[in-house]
Amino acid sequence: MGKNFLLEIGTEEMPAHFIDPAIRQMYDFSLEYFKNKKISLESVKIWATPRRLVVYIENLGEKQEAQEEEIRGPAAHIGYKDGMWTEVAKRFVEQYGASLEDLHIEETPKGKYIFLRKVKEGMNTLEILPDYITSLLKSIRFPKMMKWGDVDFYFGRPIRWIVALYGDTEIEVEIAGVKSSRYSRPPRFLPQIPIEIRDADSYLNVMRENYIIVDQEERKNEILKQINKIANENSFILDYEDDLLKEVNYLVEYPTALLGEFDKKYLALPEVVLIITMEKKQRYFPLRDADGNLTNKFIVIRNGTDNYKDIVIQGNEKVLKARLSDAEYYYHEDTKHPLEKYTEKLSGIIFQEQLGTIKDKVERVRILVREIANILGLSSEENKILERSVNLYKADLGTLMVSEYPELHGIMGRIYAKISGEKDPIPEVIGEYIYPRTLDDRLPSNFLASILGIADRIDSLTGYFALDLFPTGSEDPIGLRRISGGLLRLLLESSLKLNLRNLFVKSFEIYNFGEKYPLSQIDKGMGFIGQRLRNLLLDRYSIDIVDAVMEVGYDEMWRLKRRLDFISKFKEKESYEKLKKALNRLYRILPKDFTPKEVSENLLSSPFEKKLYEDYLKIKNEIFNDILEGNYEVLLSYDFLNEFSDDIEKFFDNVLVMSPNEDERINRLSLLSLIKLLFWEILDWSRLS
């Protein structure tokens, strides 16, 4: 029978975004550790607050399982003679503290040997737990690690106390100069009297009694209960991002929801400014009325009880008023001038130290946009809209509002463009080029915004690729993963017929690096893009489909997307298995570096190879142009594939491909190679499961 185990790591306040990754790591490590140590357990629970990381293991076994091991001893003919164990065998068992009854003889590849079957008793869990605690804390990786004082230990934030209990027994361990005990600490809003934890079983209740809700799910539900109660009692509608709830949950240990308000005059500001100020700057929950209009009310989550709540509300209202007053000033100052005026400031804003200013970037993007427009054959009106949009799309970076609220770039550009009287759809293009900002964000509704977004991201990535600023491990300070993710979604879902590699090469030319940076950096960049693309596609398609399609190239995302959609549907058809099997047979026989020649009909002697050649010509004439155009779905209704698959099988069953006659052999290999190349236009069939 096991006991419950408790480990509480008390720290200084941990940034909210550090906590979820730590929870996952602690859970995985704990399961793996005790599995490897062969100690049974019922469940592992990881709880967290801003100041505590907690492992709670239910019914952790009191000792390791006994392990049976076999030790090979001397050869049987030495240790066992005339039905008796020899002195050699006796010395062998004495060496391991065993008896002759534990010996047996087994046949091995090297002959018969004596083996000792020994049961190794498991260690007590109490002896193992100090190592578990130390190993666990050393294993956790945070987005940023820190060292404090003169201790040689790295963690997300300084460790201040450790509680470690197995049942009611203290586990003695010292980490980063902190010795474990059974005493936790109260929240900061209470007198700092240590909290005694008598045993692991009583932990949650003792913490609740001291105004600490350790379980993040319980805490989140408490927040939801309270904010919904306030909203319902006042006939308001809650409207907030999911990330806000997650962040607030990791900012408090004992949540209390309070209703505050601000001056109605600030409702004249753009709604997005109010929401960003409340959600991002202050972590408040905005409230709407029954008609969906934003109100001048908000909910703040206090870390503590409702004692002195009026003072707390007034303090939060005062802080919000100051922020909104600043925003009002920025807005009024910004709107004194048309948006175009702020383009003058772009030459003073650095894009990247070695890649120039934002103005330099705009000029590069302008050339790239013209190139894309030419490739796509845009109309003169569409070209004019794009030209004007390029002029203005970074202008809001020169405004006061975006200087204070960088996350509003593009969004304020759209608002200011409308106020400045820019004609539709220019404000829309300016405001939407930023999307998607994350992998699950929305896409632009206007394809011209997609073009601008593609050009902007291509320019950024080309510069970073040239400078070799690739992410290392989990670190990605420039945000290459985010930028490339947005680019890939635009290319995959916009269906614009563009070649990604060619755009990178063109962008590289526009930068005019000269001999400073090699063009080969684009190859390295495409490798990085390929890995990002594969990860993105694996969320939607099976691994064999993704690898089969990517193997034939991913320069043209529109083709890749069509190939993926085609094979996903084709897999459901009866002809799929036959064609895959036939083509795989063909793939296996072709030498890797074989270069096909033109097939000579005069050398086709067998009726089976003649028929296969006719099949090849038929497919080439009837649907190959469709395949080249990316119309792969024509194959879904192409009934000839069944007959073609049968003819490949008949060819292999009746024709000697590797003929002793060299001309005949090369001719047959050339026919097979041409068939492979024809279907290679779609995917690598050998990778399909």
From Swiss-Prot:
The keyword Cytoplasm applies. It holds the Pfam family tRNA_synt_2f. One of its GO terms (biological process) is arginyl-tRNA aminoacylation. It catalyses: tRNA(Gly) + glycine + ATP = glycyl-tRNA(Gly) + AMP + diphosphate. It comes from the Bacteria. It is found in: Cytoplasm. GO terms for molecular function: arginine-tRNA ligase activity; ATP binding; glycine-tRNA ligase activity. One of its GO terms (cellular component) is cytosol. Keywords: Aminoacyl-tRNA synthetase, ATP-binding, Cytoplasm, Ligase, Nucleotide-binding, Protein biosynthesis. InterPro entries: DALR_anticod-bd, Gly-tRNA-synth_bsu, Gly-tRNA-synth_heterodimer. Its EC number is 6.1.1.14. Belongs to the class-II aminoacyl-tRNA synthetase family. Tetramer of two alpha and two beta subunits. This is Glycine--tRNA ligase beta subunit.
